[in-house]
Amino acid sequence: MAESEESSWLVIDGYEDEPAAFGVPPYVGFHIRYICGVLESKNLEYEYCPIDSFRINPPNLENRLGVIILAGAVVPGKYLRGTPISLKETREIISNTPNETPILCGGWAIRGWKNQGWSPLRHNLFLALKDTDATLSNYLETGEWRHNRRTAEQWTAWAQAGAKSKAVTDNPDLSGPLTYEVEVYQGCVRFKRGCKFCIEPKKGIPIWRDPEDIIKEVSIA
């Protein structure tokens, strides 16, 4: 995997697999694209690395502006083209990253591990419990970690910026059979008494994207 001579962010795609989101190859998830979209919109250097590529040829963790790990596989399953990141692998990446480098971990697996008692002690490590992309954006603007949710305007901007991000252009499956998943809304009408196996009700009242924004995102991709 190519290394940048300049300091850059490292985005590790640990994949997501939710009842309403497929992010395990050949799918490229929308949440990882939003994260890359934040970095794209701020013109920051970054490297995109799927966890399967990380296992084969780990990128250098030195000289990084920061490391972002998305771990969102919460549905048990068997996969044909990839394997989501494990808690053990997440721990190893964190321990191998220089102490002065900020680390942001997000995704529903991170929330699940935290609820099960995982509470790593490390300087400048943040476990995002809301939108990872919005949390990252706030950190880049203020230098402070805080749980944030994206606004409708941010959703549009980061979705469209993410459509042409390295999560797509540097994806190992770009030549085929990469499948680009699109998020049209989040949440569930049964947010008070939703299905116990599903996490969508936990996102609250449904929020819909504007159809024109979705069409533009797809046209960019």
Q: Where does each model-flagged region fall?
A:
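Short Fe-S-cluster ligation motifs
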Residues: 217-221
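Acidic, low-complexity intrinsically disordered segments
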Residues: 2-216
